[in-house]
């Protein structure tokens, strides 16, 4: 992967100080960016408008959300939002930005000590559906002002070229994520890429079998949530089981978006699971387990958001009750050795889903010794 604009990037000893306090400049950030940054802050556990623990010399991260208006939701015009940050990374895409976001997030996993040990932070800012050069250049200029790095996924060769040139001229360190992949596939297939963006008028949008299969899977999964319609468990591709708050519903939804019909069944202490569960082919059933203290913490957070009384809280998140529920689930798993049991403690949904799909396909494909998940395009 090539890094562009390295020569124009600030040297560490000449990097301008990050303004703090009331003198911090206001940055122009789109409403989409503002909402996305807020979501990132919530997922990472950082409270909005509150400083995180830091050393005296480390920058403070603060995310402040402006009140969106109906007009702002429809347009991508810039608004004034004050953001105090450590290092910034811009993600620019002519589509949803999914590829750029997930690629960079995967890479950032290699630098966890940057925020943990150095007391600093990295803020990623997503700019999606960037399909005109004027807006592209405006974003890169803003990146230059912030001393940000820029990653882009632009299918149009002209736009990708403009992004590289602008980053080089403005001294912005940049990476073209999609370009090398497109070039490699073009060479392998022996054909030229279309160069059309995801939403281009000339692009053929076919509603193929895979599309309808995905819609059908999502609809099925929604209807089968939380043990509903147990008589349909045999129709599921994958069945997830486990005690409350092990992530069955979000995991089911995530896997369903990949075209798999997923059902989930909760284990409630003292209540035997439906008989139809034990009639499902064992390789399709996946048990979820989690560490005791982690599950208790998740449940405590849940009951606080619901505002229940102390007695109800103890009946749901009390340590003795949680331990008994986990033991109850373990006994069911022991009686069904054909089920794969996965520890979801501190795992992202994507990680658990990847494990489940690998095991699911391992059990189906016996034609090769190397596990694979195959798709046709």
From Swiss-Prot:
Biased composition (Basic and acidic residues): 46-63
The keyword ATP-binding is assigned to this record: no
Known catalytic reactions: N(tele)-phospho-L-histidyl/L-threonyl-[pyruvate, phosphate dikinase] + ADP = N(tele)-phospho-L-histidyl/O-phospho-L-threonyl-[pyruvate, phosphate dikinase] + AMP + H(+); N(tele)-phospho-L-histidyl/O-phospho-L-threonyl-[pyruvate, phosphate dikinase] + phosphate + H(+) = N(tele)-phospho-L-histidyl/L-threonyl-[pyruvate, phosphate dikinase] + diphosphate
One Pfam match: Kinase-PPPase
Region of interest (Disordered), residue spans: 1-76
Molecular function GO labels: ATP binding; phosphotransferase activity, phosphate group as acceptor; protein kinase activity; protein serine/threonine kinase activity
Biased composition (Low complexity): 22-33
Keyword Magnesium applies: no
Gene Ontology cellular-component terms listed: chloroplast; cytosol
Binding sites annotated in the UniProt record for ADP: 242-249
Inhibition and activation profile: Regulated by light/dark exposure.
Subunit structure: Interacts with PPDK1.
Known function: Bifunctional serine/threonine kinase and phosphorylase involved in the dark/light-mediated regulation of PPDK by catalyzing its phosphorylation/dephosphorylation. Has a much lower phosphotransferase activity than PDRP1. Can use ADP as a high specificity substrate and GDP as a lower affinity substrate, but has no activity with UDP.
Other remarks in the entry: Was thought to be devoided of phosphorylase activity, but possess a much slower rate of phosphotransferase than PDRP1.
NCBIfam families: PRK05339.1
HAMAP family linked: PDRP (MF_00921)
Protein name from the UniProt record: Pyruvate, phosphate dikinase regulatory protein 2
